[in-house]
Amino acid sequence: VCSSDLIYKGDYMENVLDGERIIKVNIENQMKSAYIDYSMSVIVSRALPDARDGLKPVHRRVLFGMHEIGVLSNRPYKKSARIVGEVLGKYHPHGDTSVYDSMVRMAQEWSLRYPLVQGQGNFGSIDGDNPAAMRYTEVRLRKIAEEMLVDIEKDTVDHQLNFDDSLKEPIVLPTQFPNLLVNGASGIAVGMATNMAPHNLTQVIDGTLAYIDNREIEMDDLIRIVQAPDFPTGGIIYGYEGVKSAFETGRGRVMMRGDITVEESSTGKERLVVSSIPFQVNKAEMIRKTADLINDKRIDGISDINDESDRNGMRIVYDLKRDAIPNIVINKLYQLTALQSSFSVNNVALVKGRPRTLNLKDLIHYFVEHRHEVVTKRTEYELKEAEKKAHILEGLLVALDNLDEVITLIRASQTPEEARNGLITKFGLTELQARAILDMRLQKLTGLERGKIKNEYQ
C-alpha cells in the first residue's frame, strides 16, 4: 500500500483503496496480550492434564477417535495411520507427529504403568529406539482404556465443537478409575510444568473407597493405603521423605534405584545382575556411560558388561573381577550411574480450566466429584430413555386393547399420514405413539408378544 493511499484518523490508519484499517497499538501491551493468550492456550489445550480423567487433549482425542471407529480390545487391530488420520482430520489439527507420538507412548509398557493402547509392531524400546512409521504399526484399545469410555454415549460428560464446528468431542472422559494417579503425567507449559508419578491401581482404588467412606480421612491414613509411586520399569524407592512430601504437598523428590542382585557364574566368578532400572532412564545410554566410567577407571572391579534383556524381562550382567567386593561396586554404580536417579514430583493439573498443585487427597477428591457427576448424568439419561420407552409402550397397549378398531382405521386410510392423524384423533395418542403403532410388526399381535409388551411396561 502506498503512503499516499493511507488516511490517518486518530488511533488508526485507513487504506482508501482496499477499505482496510490499521490500528496503532503499544507494542509492549500487544506482546503482553499475545503472550498471555499463547501461554493459556498451551496450558489449557496442550501441556497439562485434566484432574478428572488425567488426560491431555491429544490423548483424549486419540482414545475417543479409536472408540468412535470401534478399534476395541476384542476387535482386530487397525493401522496406526488410519487412527492418526481419523484424529487429525476430525479433532486434532496439529500435525500427524504429535498424534502418533502420543499414541505410541500410550502403547509403551515402560512409559505407562497401565498402557491404554495395545500395539502390534515396532513401538520403540527402553533403549531409546524409535518406533516404526505409522504405516507399519497397528493398534487397538486395551480393556482398561475402554473403562475410561464406558457410558460416554449416555450424555455423561459435556461435549464441545471440534476445530471446524462440524463434530462434537468430549471435554473430559467419564473414566471409571483415577487415571491421573494411576498413570501419572508429564508436560511443560509456559511458566509451569507438571511431573506426576504413576501408582498401583489396587492401592489407588482402595484409597478412593476409603475417601468415599470418610471424606474427612486423614492424610496419614490415605498414605498407609496408597503407599508410594509404582513405576512401570520397577526398581526400588530409596528413602521415604520425598514420597511423603509429594503426597502431602504435591511436590517432592523421589529417589529411585535399579534392583541389583549378586550371582555366581558357572566359572565360579561373581557377577551383578540388574533386573530393573529407574523410571525414564534410557537403558542403552546408561550401559554406554557405565562403560565409559569403567574405561576412565572411575569404577573399578567390573571386567565386562552384557545386556541379556529379552521379551521375558530385563537382565543387565556386570561381570566382576576376582578381587572385587560386590557391595563396593554396587555403591559405586548407584553413586555414579543412572542406576540411582530421582523423580521430581510436581502435581500440577487443570481444575475447572485452571492449573493447580494437588496433593493425594485433592487428586482423589476431584476424581470422586467427577464420578458423582457422571453417575448422576447417566441416571438422568437412563430415566429419560425409560420414560420415552414407557410412553411408546402405553400407545402400543392402547392399540392392542382396541385392535379391531385400529386395524379398521388403518385399512380405511389412504396414506400413512391419514392413518397417523386418525389414531391421534380417535385414541388421544401422541404423534410418537401413533408412529410406533404404524411401525409395529404383525407378530406383535400374537398373544405371547402382547404379554411381553405388558410385562415390559410394568
Residue ranges and their predicted role:
Residues 1-3:
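Short, small-residue-biased leader/transition segments that mark boundaries at the very start
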Residues 8-250, 315-317:
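Catalytic phosphate-handling regions of large nucleic-acid enzymes and associated NTPases
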Residues 7-12, 18-20, 27, 186, ...:
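C-terminal interaction appendages of subunits in large macromolecular complexes
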